């Protein structure tokens, strides 16, 4: 299917996948650091931003992963395997593509799917529902209310450790997306299951904000079981959407995670 997207920069292709209720603009703060070194593709997931929500079957997660896999192939030049990075739901999608061996590498920022049990998943989805309920209560007064920092900053605090980094226009767009998104209500039905056999040859990087209030950092301990090859790091002082909290740091993590394999091997050899 065709998904709304933007392409900029040059170098190895790096596809960036946002989280649930977000938009491809979630990555805007990184583009200046990434595009001199990567051909960056930012995409709106189905039912997000400018991408339409297709008719969904019983396996919503599998359908999303297949749609993104098809999209990645469409936007990647012939003869190249793309690198993929994602945040939250986008992080899980990136890891799923790595598990299937569909991509050159995967970098996941506070990825979904590592809930310690079903109650943990319920807690995460109910957090989104509570935030959406608050935004809906504001109704037509939402644009005016968000102009006040005393309202805007607390409204964003679940997602960002530093909500002051989010401008008014972006905050309004994000809140409207939260209100209108239809996938949140399917969150409890989503099956976060990896293939029985995970490709261990695909490089994986997982970075988790220590101040993540949506998907707490304790979930990170579950990453190594399915991805023993993963480079796992905890990021002090960063929240669920770390791209906005610390653009330069996250850019460096994405560049390192998507380093071509040959260069990666040389770096390791030199370090040794």
Label for each model-derived stretch:
Residues 91-101, 106:
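Short glycine-enriched nucleophile-adjacent loop
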Residues 103-139:
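Flexible "cap/lid" loop of the alpha/beta hydrolase fold
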Residues 229-272:
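Catalytic active-site module of serine/aspartate enzymes centered on a nucleophile-bearing elbow/loop
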Residues 141-198:
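Conserved alpha/beta-hydrolase catalytic His-Asp/Glu region
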Residues 2, 8, 41-89, 252:
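Active-site loop/oxyanion-hole signature of alpha/beta-hydrolase fold enzymes
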Residues 180-225, 234:
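Conserved serine/cysteine hydrolase catalytic core
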Residues 6-53:
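Conserved HGGG/HGGXW glycine-rich cap/lid loop of the alpha/beta-hydrolase fold
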Residues 26-28, 51-57, 117-120, 217-218:
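Conserved catalytic-core motifs of eukaryotic protein kinase domains, centered on the activation segment
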């Amino acid at each position: 299917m065709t998904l709304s997207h933007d392409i900029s920069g040059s170098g190895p292709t790096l596809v960036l996948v946002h989280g649930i209720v977000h938009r491809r603009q979630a990555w805007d703060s990184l583009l200046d650091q990434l595009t001199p070194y990567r051909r960056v593709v930012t995409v709106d997931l189905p039912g997000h931003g400018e991408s339409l929500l297709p008719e969904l079957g019983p396996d919503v997660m599998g359908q999303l992963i297949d749609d993104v896999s098809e999209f990645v192939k469409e936007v990647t030049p012939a003869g190249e395997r793309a690198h993929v990075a994602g945040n939250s739901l986008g992080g899980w999608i990136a890891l799923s593509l790595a598990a299937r061996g569909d991509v050159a590498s995967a970098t996941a920022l506070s990825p979904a799917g590592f809930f310690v049990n079903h109650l943990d998943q319920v807690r995460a989805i109910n957090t989104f529902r509570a935030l959406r309920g608050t935004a809906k209560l504001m109704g037509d007064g939402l644009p005016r209310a968000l102009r006040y920092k005393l309202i805007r900053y607390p409204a964003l605090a679940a997602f960002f450790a530093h909500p002051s980094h989010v401008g008014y226009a972006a905050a309004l767009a994000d809140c409207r997306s939260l209100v209108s998104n239809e996938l949140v209500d399917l969150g409890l039905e989503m099956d976060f299951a990896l293939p029985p056999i995970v490709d261990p040859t695909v490089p994986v990087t997982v970075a988790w904000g220590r101040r993540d209030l949506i998907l707490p950092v304790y979930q990170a301990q579950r990453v190594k079981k399915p991805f023993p090859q993963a480079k796992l790091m905890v990021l002090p002082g960063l929240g669920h959407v770390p791209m906005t909290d610390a653009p330069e740091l996250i850019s460096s993590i994405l560049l390192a995670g998507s380093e071509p394999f040959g260069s990666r091997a040389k770096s390791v050899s030199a370090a040794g």
